[in-house]
UniProtKB/Swiss-Prot annotation:
GO terms for molecular function: fluoride transmembrane transporter activity. Glycans are attached at residues 109, 117, 235. It is found in: Cell membrane. One of its GO terms (cellular component) is cell periphery. InterPro entries: FluC. The gene is FEX2. It is a multi-pass membrane protein. Keywords: Cell membrane, Glycoprotein, Membrane, Transmembrane, Transmembrane helix. This is Fluoride export protein 2. Signal peptide: none annotated.
Length: 375
């Protein structure tokens, strides 16, 4: 085999481009989710806080827009940017494991507010209603946001932002693969055959170029910034604003690797996303148990009873677990499956994840008890 330095350098630069862009969007997605959660936590709120409902809604809408832009070949020259926005930013902005934790806490009456105020459900059967309330609201809002985003991208952005028709194209071999769960090559090919491929207006091309270059350039400065802030500030920001973004980088790449490795094994069941969501839910149950579980049955002191340790666990919950799992890709994959396969995929994912929370967090809560964390 003849070594070609030109090809090798091209692949290396492509991988560096993917790494930097994906890292930037993972950091921004995690930080955005933290900000939206903090912004939506107020009294009296129509949507009970804290919740990731707003984050899931926003990420699914953006995912829908990007799907339409890519289907009409707007992103053909910016496939790395497309990967960063969909799998990176939208994946980090939304959270499957946090949704499952909300579902478990509300259905078992174990939210922080219920424990602090000694609030009880009329009877335990109302836990079923709470379970369905969280499940249906999250899924319906997320699916509705995805569909709205796709129509917004198709009927508004593509329809009014295209300058002309362009020639069909063949994606390069080093572009983003469809195994990540966020690329629909079948829809793209269908639009090409129907001569629906369009060229974005110069403004959008320039905008994509600027965002792509910024994401490429900001990766290492952002990493250095958050490392310095995390080391310097020892207050609540470590568990809420700085550490979660650093943990989110590793979680985002793990989720992408799982999707690349396992989604192609079964087209009717995206195994990679399933493994990422289930594993993240298992971890969030364990971390929540450590943070909120009573150290002794007779006291309200949690297992993690130092402030710094509590901040680290909080960062693992919101940063690593929140970014490792995703609703935007989960909903987008279900949208592209047949209705029966979608039901199977959603039911198995949610059912197994909820059972893992019952086994880990539930068993400890019902034997030793939960309390509010110290941070």
């Amino acid at each position: 085999m003849i070594f070609n330095p030109v090809i090798s350098n091209h692949k290396l630069s492509h991988y560096i481009h993917v790494f930097c862009t994906f890292t930037t969007f993972c950091i921004l997605g995690t930080e955005t989710r933290q900000a939206i959660t903090a912004l939506s936590t107020y009294t009296p709120a129509f949507v009970t806080a804290p919740t990731v409902l707003w984050s899931n809604c926003s990420s699914c809408m953006l995912m829908g827009i990007m799907q339409s832009l890519n289907a009409y070949t707007w992103m053909k020259d910016h496939q790395v940017l497309f990967l960063g926005v969909t799998t990176g930013y939208c994946g980090a902005l939304s959270s499957f494991s946090s949704m499952l934790l909300e579902m478990f806490e509300h259905s078992t009456n174990l939210t922080n507010g219920n424990i602090a105020n000694h609030t009880k459900l009329p009877n335990r059967a109302y836990g079923i209603m709470e379970f369905l309330s969280v499940l249906l609201v999250h899924l319906m809002v997320s699916m509705g946001s995805l569909i709205f985003g796709r129509q917004l991208g198709k009927e508004v952005i593509v329809a009014y932002g295209s300058s002309s028709f362009s020639k069909p194209y063949t994606p390069p071999s080093d572009t983003v693969k469809e195994n990540a769960g966020d690329v629909d090559t079948q829809e793209m090919e269908k639009n090409i055959l129907e001569f629906k491929f369009k060229t974005p207006a110069p403004f959008f091309k320039k905008f994509f170029d600027v965002v792509d270059k910024l994401a490429y350039a900001l990766a290492f400065p952002l990493i250095i910034l958050f490392v310095v802030l995390c080391a310097y500030y020892e207050n609540y920001s470590r568990g809420k604003w700085t550490l979660p973004c650093l943990f989110g980088i590793f979680a985002g790449f793990l989720r992408y690797w799982l999707a690349e490795m396992f989604n192609k094994t079964n087209k009717k069941f995206p195994l990679g996303t399933f493994l990422a969501n289930v594993f993240a839910t298992l971890l969030i149950g364990i971390f929540t148990m450590v943070q909120r579980g009573k150290k002794h049955f007779s006291t309200d002191i949690p297992i993690v009873n130092s402030l710094n340790s509590c901040h680290i666990v909080s960062a693992l919950i919101s940063g690593f677990c929140g970014t490792l799992s995703t609703i935007s890709t989960f909903i987008n994959e279900g949208y592209k499956l047949s209705f029966i396969n979608m039901l199977i995929y959603y039911t198995v994912s949610i059912g197994i994840s909820y059972c893992l929370l019952v086994i880990t967090l539930g068993s400890y809560a019902w034997t030793r008890g939960l309390t509010n964390p110290i941070c």
